[in-house]
Design a protein with these regions (language model features):
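N-terminal secretory/targeting leader peptides
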Residues: 2-3, 9-19, 26-122, 132-133, ...
């Protein structure tokens, strides 16, 4: 099967190189698309959102646009979806673009970076701060048109099989952590691994890894992480608001009508709002279950660790920006917007939450 998949990708790449124009399958006026997801079909949030997005697009188009969702490892492996769509072997993907940072380090900024923009701030930058134009510029290099499609909000710091209180506690720790957050941990001496969502629980249970972040209480409980690790840390410094993308083959996108593109854009933006609202509501319910489990200890990373995370995060982001001119351009725009929302936030949301806590104590 792996050999066949490689052949499919190689064949699609050859077609693209020869100038072939990807086009949806059309039957009786219905355009059919293959959407490959980086997530298991039933995984709460990321997996279920892909299905819901496909249903929304079908409903909004009166059935004229039909997306068939292929969950992770069915048509292609989870981390191969970008290449599949780029080459034309699939039409669209649903994935966190940090997974594909080796294509361009700039992709990190359109998903989530340590101590970066929160979910609503990221939406503001992409929609009204110049982020979408930069994202289009980055992904166009790979024949991709990107759209925001999901946000799971602030992440948790992860599940551990022991307490961590000092930077030394991270030395030698086998930790499942994505992308730029992983680089922060490497500099603290951790051994960082990349593990697909459906393999995390087994890896923790077997002792192959000592700790793992994933998302938050809702999907973490569904995966069974609370059954195989006792210590649940917050906050997730590495992902303050994680965005997943709907990536569309660019040549295919350009061949759609204005109406069809508007339907897909509107459905994707609606799914961002819906997914974030759902994550907040379901995390509340799942957190109650975790608090009721006397074995699970929910702990905050102490101030000393947070300072170390912050210092190393600044270094990692600056070094990432220096990788190439386009990434520097994205970084400069992102950081300028971050400075602005932090300034405004001190007078608005941060102030409101602080005073609300005081008023309702």
């Amino acid at each position: 099967m792996k050999t066949r998949r490689r052949n499919v990708l190689l064949g699609a790449t050859a077609i693209a190189a020869a100038g072939g124009l990807p086009a949806p399958a059309i039957a009786q006026g219905v355009k059919e698309f293959k959407l490959v997801s980086a997530y298991p079909r039933d995984l709460p949030g990321t997996g279920t959102s892909a299905e819901r997005l496909a249903q929304s697009i079908a409903a909004m188009s009166d059935g004229r646009l039909k997306l068939t969702v292929y969950p992770a490892n069915s048509l292609v492996r989870a981390f191969e979806v970008f290449d599949a769509v780029s080459a034309g072997a699939a039409d669209m993907y649903f994935a966190d673009e940090k997974y594909f940072r080796e294509k361009s380090p700039a992709l990190n900024f359109f998903a989530s970076v340590p101590y970066g923009l929160t979910a609503d701030e990221l939406c503001s930058w992409i929609l009204f701060g110049g982020g979408q134009a930069l994202w289009d510029e980055v992904d166009a290099q790979f024949n991709i048109k990107p759209l925001m499609a999901l946000n799971t909000g602030v992440q948790m710091g992860g599940w551990f099989n022991k307490e961590v209180n000092t930077p030394e506690d991270f030395k030698g720790l086998r930790y499942r952590m994505p992308e730029l957050g992983a680089e922060v941990l490497r500099r603290m001496g951790a051994t960082v691994v990349t593990t697909p969502a459906d393999e995390i629980t087994g890896a923790l249970k077997s002792g192959a890894i000592d700790a793992s972040e994933y998302v938050g209480p809702w999907p973490d409980v569904w995966l069974g992480l609370s059954k195989v690790a006792d210590y649940y840390y917050y906050p997730g410094f590495h992902e303050p608001g994680d965005n997943s993308a709907l990536g569309i083959n660019k040549k295919l996108w350009e061949g759609l009508t204005t109406s069809e593109r508007a339907i897909i854009e509107t459905a994707a933006q609606a799914e961002v709002t819906r997914s974030l609202a759902e994550a907040n509501a379901e995390n509340i319910r799942a957190l109650k279950l975790l608090r009721a489990d006397t074995r699970v200890k929910i702990l905050r990373f102490n101030d000393d660790l947070i300072r170390v995370f912050g210092k190393l995060s600044k270094e990692v982001l600056a070094e990432t920006a220096a990788r190439d001119p386009l990434t520097r351009k994205v970084y400069d725009s992102y950081m300028a917007f971050l400075a602005g929302v932090m300034d405004w936030g001190e007078l608005s949301e941060t102030s409101d939450r602080d005073t609300r806590r005081l008023a309702l104590a």
